[in-house]
């Protein structure tokens, strides 16, 4: 089964780069993308993605607010947060919310492959166990 991906980042060049990641290698399809958290929340409700890849610092609603919203409404959604700030406080908040992973920008694509592979495997295992 194809996994649905939602990508959120307020920097167009980063958003474009994340969209060009070889998602199909992992059986994933991008269902939406947005440049602010508020639009991201609307897309979460519209598509109920399996994975949300979100920047932390965005206009309207930040990635932490988006992650809390998604986890409250769709607890099985896996969230990977991205940030250019190496801040312990962001990492703490991410852990408290229950995000799957936390990546620093600029994104190392080798590390991203590891994180996406691990996250997809976890989702598929959980889906299989629920059947």
What are these regions (language model features)?
Residues 17-22, 112:
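Short hydrophobic helical patches associated with two-component signaling proteins
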Residues 3, 28-29, 77:
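A structural micro-motif
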Residues 2-14, 18-19:
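Conserved acidic segment of CheY-like receiver
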Residues 8-9, 34, 52:
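Conserved sequence signature across two-component system core domains
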Residues 25-26, 74:
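A structural signal for short coil/turn segments at secondary-structure junctions
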